[in-house]
Regions:
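Terminal-tail/helix-coil boundary detector
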Residues: 191-199
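Conserved beta-strand edge residues that scaffold enzyme active sites
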Residues: 32-35, 176, 194
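GST-like domain detector, emphasizing the conserved glutathione-binding G-site
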Residues: 1-121, 127
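Short Asp/Glu-rich motifs
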Residues: 37-39, 181, 199
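GST-like fold's C-terminal all-alpha helical module
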Residues: 101-184, 188, 192
């Protein structure tokens, strides 16, 4: 399989972590999304022109949620909980992150560089952080469910982003945030992202 990723693409990193969880090896092709020629080249691999995209033989799967579902099938369900109810919750949480938290995306952009912590949080970010805290409080610890899965892969990148801007959650939510920050798959993903930057 070949995974088409973008430099500093959070969704590429989330899919990469899911691949590690599923014990699937990728050949990685890195796209520099700030380079117009390189970005135009994405359409060679992705019908949407977006990353990540997965190429498996003649099959092309685009969009991170679809890719994760494909990886989950290849790995006999390894990325989601065994319980049907928990699987539904896990998919809901992944979808919520996929489509939401726009204030954090716009005002706390993902970066591998050191950034200044936010001194104040506007109403939009405050509301989103409150929702994240509610989600994180549900964690069974050290993962969201009884084993590491797609939800942890998705929200670990968010935990990293929050921490970079000095947003540290409290109580059980804070315990889950710290657990994600300590998670070796997240740390490996950050190293991988830095390696992508040099390509």
């Amino acid at each position: 399989m070949e995974l088409i990723v973008g430099k500093e693409s959070t969704w590429s990193l989330r899919v990469w972590i899911c691949g590690q969880l599923a014990n699937i090896d990728f050949n990685i092709k890195v796209i520099d999304l700030t380079d117009s020629d390189d970005k135009a080249h994405v359409f060679t691999f992705s019908p949407s022109g977006l990353v990540p995209a997965l190429v498996d033989g003649s099959l092309v799967v685009h969009d991170s949620l679809a890719i994760v579902e494909y990886l989950n099938e290849q790995a006999n369900g390894a990325l989601f909980p065994d319980s049907v109810n928990e699987r539904a919750i896990a998919r809901s949480l992944c979808s919520e992150l996929h489509s939401g938290f726009m204030n954090l995306r716009e005002q706390c952009s993902f970066t591998l560089e050191n950034v200044m912590p936010l001194s104040t949080l506007n109403d939009g970010i405050t509301n989103e952080v409150s929702r994240i805290e509610t989600i994180f409080e549900q964690a069974q610890l050290p993962y969201m469910f009884d084993k590491a899965g797609a939800v942890d892969a998705f929200y670990s990148i968010l935990a990293y982003r929050l921490n970079a801007y000095g947003i540290v959650l409290n109580g059980r939510a804070g315990d889950y945030q710290q657990s994600l920050l300590d998670w070796h798959f997240l740390q490996d993903a950050i190293k991988e992202a830095k390696a992508w930057e040099s390509k």
